[in-house]
Amino acid sequence: MSKQSSIEQDGKILEALSNAMFRVELSNGHQVIAHISGKMRMNYIKILPGDKVRMEMSPYDLTKGRIVFRYK
């Protein structure tokens, strides 16, 4: 069986939660909970409320995601 591809969406950080989790508002208005990817953690990339980010989401659970990029 092949692995399903993830859905990429852009969003804006609304608030920082505990354990490197964030509440993100997507461009279509939905709010999801997202965590930082491992590469961003290793490179100490800081994310603050108001930042624009790119997220990956599983097609099976659209309420959770992984932040993979922070726009400048």
From Swiss-Prot:
Subcellular location(s) of the protein: Cytoplasm
Domain named S1-like: residues: 1-72
Keywords in alphabetical order: Cytoplasm, Initiation factor, Protein biosynthesis, RNA-binding, rRNA-binding
Molecular function, one GO term: ribosome binding
A Pfam family that the UniProt record links to this protein: eIF-1a
Record flagged with keyword rRNA-binding: yes
Domain of life: Bacteria
UniProt-listed InterPro entries: NA-bd_OB-fold, RNA-binding_domain_S1_IF1, S1_domain, TIF_IF1
Gene3D superfamilies named among the record's database cross-references: Nucleic acid-binding proteins
GO terms for cellular component: cytosol
Assembly description: Component of the 30S ribosomal translation pre-initiation complex which assembles on the 30S ribosome in the order IF-2 and IF-3, IF-1 and N-formylmethionyl-tRNA(fMet); mRNA recruitment can occur at any time during PIC assembly.
Similarity section: Belongs to the IF-1 family.
Function comment: One of the essential components for the initiation of protein synthesis. Stabilizes the binding of IF-2 and IF-3 on the 30S subunit to which N-formylmethionyl-tRNA(fMet) subsequently binds. Helps modulate mRNA selection, yielding the 30S pre-initiation complex (PIC). Upon addition of the 50S ribosomal subunit IF-1, IF-2 and IF-3 are released leaving the mature 70S translation initiation complex.
NCBIfam families recorded: infA (TIGR00008)
Official protein name in the record: Translation initiation factor IF-1
